[in-house]
Structure formats: C-alpha cells, structure tokens
C-alpha cells in the first residue's frame, strides 16, 4: 500500500515534466538577427538622397522596366513594354543643376506579347526605321522629400517637346539608386496619330529603374 501511494504522488509530476519537454522541442527557434533581415535594415538606412555619393550612375537594364499605357476604345488600357532600354544619371546631391539624366529606348524592342503585332506597331506607330531611338534628357534633377518633378526633353518620332517625369526616389544601397516615374503626354503632339480615336491620344509612361554607380 505504501509503494502504491508513493507512485500515485510521483506520476502527475512525471507527466507534467514530459509535457513541458515535448512542447519545448516542438517550438520553432526564433530567427537570428542576421542575414536577409539585417541586410534589409541596412538597405533602408540609406533612403535619404543626401546619403548617396555623387558620381555617374549607369542604368541597369535587368532592373528596369518602361511601360506605355493607352486606352483602347475606353474599355481597357492597352499595355506596351520596351525591352531595350539604356541610360545614365550624373548625380550631385549638393546641386540639382549639376545632376542630369538620359534614357534611350529602342522602339523596335516594343513587346505586347504578340510578335507579329509588335512589328506592326514598330513600323506604323513608331516608324522605327526612320526614328530608331526614343530619347529623354533632363539637366536638372532635384529630389525633395523623396519626390521629384523632372522636366526634360523627349525626342520622339522626330519631335522634341518638354515632358515632366514625376518620380519617387526609392533609396540608395550597395552602389545602386532606385526610382519610380510616371509621365503623361499626347502622342499626336509628336506626330503619332495612328489609330486615333480608337486608341487614345493620351499615353502614360511608367518607369521602374535602378542605376548603378560606376
């Protein structure tokens, strides 16, 4: 009888210890404060334009997209992408007038997902054989509170006009500077009136890009 009473006293304690041990072994460990998480914080620490060093930056085509959108019969926004984009950015954080940007686009690289239609757009819409480059240049870039209005000259279809690119500064990290940009203009101002009004006259350009410091 004495041994039975002792066992009844010990058994609940053993069960409690076993339960705690199992729970502890199945609890996932907390991730260490290293690797991607630490690197991410380091990247975000340089969101101030003043922290980016002056110099010449080259557009990274692998981290750049230029997309054009225009309404089709007011039913949807038809989307064009350009696959061949190059450019450079001379940056001076202490003087906006000393900063400038240039972007070049090959109109033959237009991509709608339909190669036959791409060729038609390049020839009839852009007249790419006659005008082989779409060029945007600006000699004054001023970033304030993460945003900038970059007024530059768009050379498109043989016509040069001022276009404002509204940009958001994404930050500087590991020799890279990132921007998002948007501009809207009338293509008829540049002599491109093919398919108006079936295809809208207003064109919106969306740019996502990174520049790498040389």
Model-inferred region functions:
Residues 2-11:
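Bacterial N-terminal signal peptides that target proteins for export
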Residues 23-214:
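Low-complexity, acidic/polar, glycine-enriched regions of mature
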Residues 10-21:
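Bacterial N-terminal signal peptides
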